[in-house]
From Swiss-Prot:
Annotated gene: Marchf4
Binding residues for Zn(2+) 2: C178, C180, C204, C207
Species assigned in the record: Mus musculus
Places the protein is found: Golgi apparatus membrane
Taxonomic lineage: Eukaryota, Metazoa, Chordata, Craniata, Vertebrata
EC top class, as a word: transferase
Function: E3 ubiquitin-protein ligase that may mediate ubiquitination of MHC-I and CD4, and promote their subsequent endocytosis and sorting to lysosomes via multivesicular bodies. E3 ubiquitin ligases accept ubiquitin from an E2 ubiquitin-conjugating enzyme in the form of a thioester and then directly transfer the ubiquitin to targeted substrates.
Biased composition (Pro residues): 102-112
Signal peptide: 1-17
Keyword set, alphabetical order: Golgi apparatus, Membrane, Metal-binding, Signal, Transferase, Transmembrane, Transmembrane helix, Ubl conjugation pathway, Zinc, Zinc-finger
Topology in the lipid bilayer: Multi-pass membrane protein
Domain of life of the native organism: Eukaryota
Compositional bias per record (Polar residues), positions renumbered to this chain: 328-343
Protein name per UniProt: E3 ubiquitin-protein ligase MARCHF4
């Protein structure tokens, strides 16, 4: 290795000496070539430093089962391996794959140089090491974030939270007022009352279970609170109130003018009779307006009542709910069974041929028999079938039967 280096140095000195002697250059350019010689010498020393102090090439990776050499990393792409293999000669002994590496000799001292801005490879870690270290740190941070997210989710599943304010039991007692389960099972009583006051509905919007709430007492009138109303709700309240007042006033005046002896002349006047008709029409309009806006006003009143009254919300009782469902199912089953029991009897009577010897007079003289217990339309059709002539029925065919299905509405 030293022979090519010596030859290179000899060739460089010869070239520089040839030009420095002035054999090929004129005298005025001597100073300039001296400066070039200094620069070239400096570049030569820098190349020598790079050549002598460069990092040794990495050793080949050992196969499975082969003993690993000290100071050689198992994987050059990871931070611990690089620290053990690549940086062992620069930072002293470190652990590599569970073994202690023997101490290596320190690097040779750098030769003096006038170039203060030169940065050799020993002044800092290589770019591959920095990139691998940053990638390892990024993977570690992502792993920690995933672990913290998973632990927070696990803790959230274990700790019950209010489905309205998302707070735990430290904000108050948690109740389960409906059939909902899981993360939407629990809620605080104040949160639920406030939600009811905003919606105006006393049933769950998910499972449609009506909350079991007990009214304790009404607040002091001085403590009553107003609820937020939209423009449409204000118009609905005003329409319902004005319609009710007009309906009360007009009905009162019509009753007085109809039955009062002093208003006898009004009842005979044509103008007042026209007014009676107009007031009657307006009363019908007011009744329709009240019926249309009544549910909205009632919902607003329930919202106001939820805010200005003290309540106690009861927990969901599964056994009681099952009993209520069973009782309701039995009632519906009895109703449907009674309807189905009446249906075959009606079909049998409709399908049975009438007695020919009794004639139409006997059928018409007993309308209060079992036929009258069914629907009115069936009774009329049954009577009409008896009133038809016998020969007309025989010509239409004796194999046809009249079958009717009667359902209750």
């Amino acid at each position: 290795m030293l022979m090519p280096l010596g030859g290179l140095l000899w060739w460089w000195c010869c070239c520089c000496g040839w030009y420095s002697c002035g054999l090929c250059t004129p005298a005025p350019q001597m100073l300039r070539h001296q400066g070039l010689l200094k620069c070239r010498c400096r570049m030569l020393f820098n190349d020598l430093k790079v050549f002598l102090l460069r990092r040794p090439p990495p050793a080949p990776l050992p196969m499975h089962g082969d003993p690993q050499l000290p100071g050689v990393a198992a994987n050059n792409n990871t931070l611990p391996a690089l620290g053990a293999g690549g940086w062992a000669g620069w930072r002293g002994p470190r652990e590599a794959v569970g073994r202690e590496t023997p101490p290596l000799p320190p690097p040779p001292p750098l030769p003096p140089s006038g170039d203060d801005d030169w940065d050799g490879p020993a002044t800092g870690p290589p770019a591959s090491l920095l990139s691998s270290a940053s990638s390892d740190e990024f993977c570690k941070e992502k792993t920690e974030d995933c672990y913290s997210l998973g632990s927070s989710l696990d803790s959230g599943m274990r700790t019950p939270l209010c489905r309205i304010c998302f707070q735990g039991p430290e904000q108050g007692e948690l109740l389960s007022p409906c059939r909902c389960d899981g993360s939407v099972k629990c809620t605080h009583q104040p949160c639920l009352i406030k939600w009811i006051s905003e919606r105006g509905c006393w049933s769950c919007e998910l499972c449609y279970y009506k909350y079991h709430v007990i009214a304790i007492s009404t607040k002091n009138p001085l403590q009553w609170q107003a609820i937020s109303l939209t423009v449409i709700e204000k118009v609905q309240i005003a329409a319902a109130i004005l319609g009710s007042l007009f309906l009360i006033a007009s009905i009162s005046w019509l009753i007085w003018s109809t039955f009062s002896p002093s208003a006898k002349w009004q009842r005979q006047d044509l103008l007042f009779q026209i007014c009676y008709g107009m007031y009657g029409f307006m009363d019908v309009v007011c009744i329709g307006l009240i019926i249309h806006e009544g549910p909205s006003v009632y919902r607003i009143f329930k919202r106001w009542q939820a805010v200005n009254q003290q309540w106690k919300v009861l927990n969901y009782d599964k056994t009681k709910d099952l009993e209520d469902q069973k009782s309701g199912g039995r009632t519906n089953l009895q109703t449907s069974s009674s309807a189905q029991a009446n249906l075959p009897s009606a079909e049998e009577e409709a399908a049975s041929p009438p007695a020919r010897e009794e004639g139409p007079t006997r059928a018409a003289s007993h309308p209060s028999g079992p036929v009258s217990q069914h629907h009115c339309a069936y009774t009329i059709l049954h009577i009409l079938s008896h009133l038809r002539p016998h020969d007309q029925r025989s010509t239409q065919g004796s194999g046809r039967e009249l079958v009717m299905r009667v359902t209750t509405v």
